[in-house]
Amino acid sequence: MGIVVPTMKASVIEVLLVLLVTGIHSNKETPKKTKRPKLTVPQINCDVKAGKIINPEFMVKCPAGCQDPKYHVYGTGVYASYSSVCGAAIHSGVLDNSGGKILVRKVAGQSGYKGSYSNGVQSLSLPRWRESFIVAESKPQKGVAYPSTLTYSSSKTAAAKAGETTKAYEKPSIPGTTIQPVTLTQAQATPVAEVTHRSTSKPFAASVTNSPRPQPVGHRSQEMEEVDGWKPGPVLLDSGFVPKEELSTQSSEPVPQGDPNCKIDLSFLIDGSTSIGKRRFRIQKQFLADVVQALDIGPAGPLVGVVQYGDNPATQFNLKTHMNSQDLKTAIEKITQRGGLSNVGRAISFVTKTFFSKANGNRGGAPNVAVVMVDGWPTDKVEEVSRVARESGINVFFITVEGAAERDIQHVVEPGFASKAVCRTNGFYSFNVQSWLSLHKTVQPLVKRVCDTDRLACSKTCLNSADIGFVIDGSSSMGTSNFRTVLQFVANLSKEFEISDTDTRVGAVQYTYEQRLEFGFDKYNSKADILSAIRRVGYWSGGTSTGAAIQYALEQLFKKSKPNKRKVMIIITDGRSYDDVRIPAMAAYQKGVITYAIGIAWAAQDELEVMATHPAKDHSFFVDDFDNLYKIAPRIIQNICTEFNSQPRN
């Protein structure tokens, strides 16, 4: 019995070893059973655009030679789906011109695709497009199956020719979600009523399925939307779906850009009063349509909105409603007459307060223009509301048709209303048309004037229309620390202005017994460059010859000022001048230079008043300590603007 027990133990151990070896062998064989097949990456040509491919995420192989400029690319980083897929891949740096595999993912459309030159490809700008895409290196995500055959929106694909109208693949995996199979069906035309997002072009109804109920391709799951980096609006993968606020004209081509030489934001105020009658109202609409056609409307050129007035004004459509001439003409034709009085003043006030806003499509950098059409004369006053419009930067034009005859003057609420309303009373902004039948002759003259942006004087504001020259005391009494405080004061004033070559320009002179030009008006064209230049000014040290410094600034700085710029000199000193300041100050006045005199500590107030432009109380300032200098900056800016807004209108 003692021999049997060890034998049984040996048998048990032998069985356990066999089972262990068998299990290990079985585990080694398991991976072979679940090994994934090799990924097949479809190849595309250089000219294939992302918008032609329905799949929301896919891998493709690009051939060599896609760097050719004939393969257009729109955007930088995020590309409009009208772009060449392979061209965008080269531009982004994912590929070079030898070709290769890439990963493509569709994202929502956006506004403002910026062009740039990168990796031998010049991408173009585009105001907006309905769908975008991004490209990345071809590194498949774990657990994601990419389509081996692409589904196109056109029937000219291999899949369509072979009758393969449906391809199945899996959605990209998203953390926290379960991968669902997605089915894409070859695009077929469907009625607009069947589509959630309305489109004026023919939509196609490719279906995306992640549940038993089919959904349009234009819709993605909530999980997909949550991981999108760009979310300006609805996510639109279907190139047939376009929100109507994004594009008024649906086309497979980029939207018309408009005339870049006439970039204005224009509001037409049309007369819808009862007195104009139906026939003349139709003539007015035809005139408006002819002007719109001549302007060449587009996002890079002029934009037009229409306000109709009677008893009260109403916006027919704003600046961003229609982005090309043809759509505008169609919209104008549909305008119906309101009736009522001719309350022009109320309409101008309405436009000033509400029309030129960002929400209505105002672009900020484009001049604001209002063209007011009047049959006869207004039934309310226009002078005060027009003054507010001018001060708001609106260039008001008046077209008066069949104005008051001598016998009718007594009935006019405000005689000379047009001259009181327009931007300038120099004839440039007024049209007096004798008959509605001759109104068509005004089309070209009006277009020429509203597009002459250099003469749109009311676009100029106190912050964007001056040449400002600082004349800075660098004498020994200043000291290094106080001089830096003065430079900070100069920077604080400068940053309040809109600085560019066509807006406000800034220059600086430093003086002691001698003078030197730190930088002229044409040296720097941006606010950042100006502020940087001010910081770099070095302290000179020496005497105080303010009179000579004024004369030097007139000759070396303001002599190069532009004719249409307001010339403003700001003198900053901490002591009495060693030389006479009266004659140089008079010379500045005679040359049209507005002088502000800023005195600190030991500066002589009587001398400040001599140098300052009349009235001295508005143009001379004194602080007893350098640390209080910053306090007067807002008052100086306010006075500059008050003076600008009160300038003679001629």
From Swiss-Prot:
One GO-annotated biological process of the protein: spinal cord development
Q: Does the keyword Hydrolase apply?
A: no
Q: Where are the transmembrane segments?
A: none
Its predominant location is: secreted
Q: Which PROSITE patterns match?
A: LCCL, VWFA
Annotated S-S bridges: C46-C62, C66-C86
- VWFA domain location: 265-450, 467-640
Q: According to its record, what are the GO cellular component terms? A: extracellular matrix; extracellular region; interstitial matrix
Source organism per UniProt: Mus musculus (Mouse)
Q: Which SUPFAM superfamilies match?
A: LCCL domain (SSF69848), vWA-like (SSF53300)
Gene field:
Vit
Identify the stretch annotated as signal peptide in this record. 1-26
Can you give the residue ranges of the LCCL domain? 40-133
Q: Does the keyword Cell inner membrane apply?
A: no
Q: Where is this region: Disordered?
A: 198-226
The subcellular localization recorded is: Secreted, Extracellular space, Extracellular matrix
Offer an example of a GO molecular function term for this protein.
glycosaminoglycan binding
As for what it does, the entry says: Promotes matrix assembly and cell adhesiveness. Plays a role in spinal cord formation by regulating the proliferation and differentiation of neural stem cells.
Query: What residues are glycosylation sites in this protein?
Result: N492
Phenotype when inactivated? Embryos show decreased spinal cord size associated with reduced cell proliferation and altered cell differentiation in the central canal of the neural tube.
The record, for Pfam families, names: LCCL, VWA
| Name of the molecule in the record | Vitrin
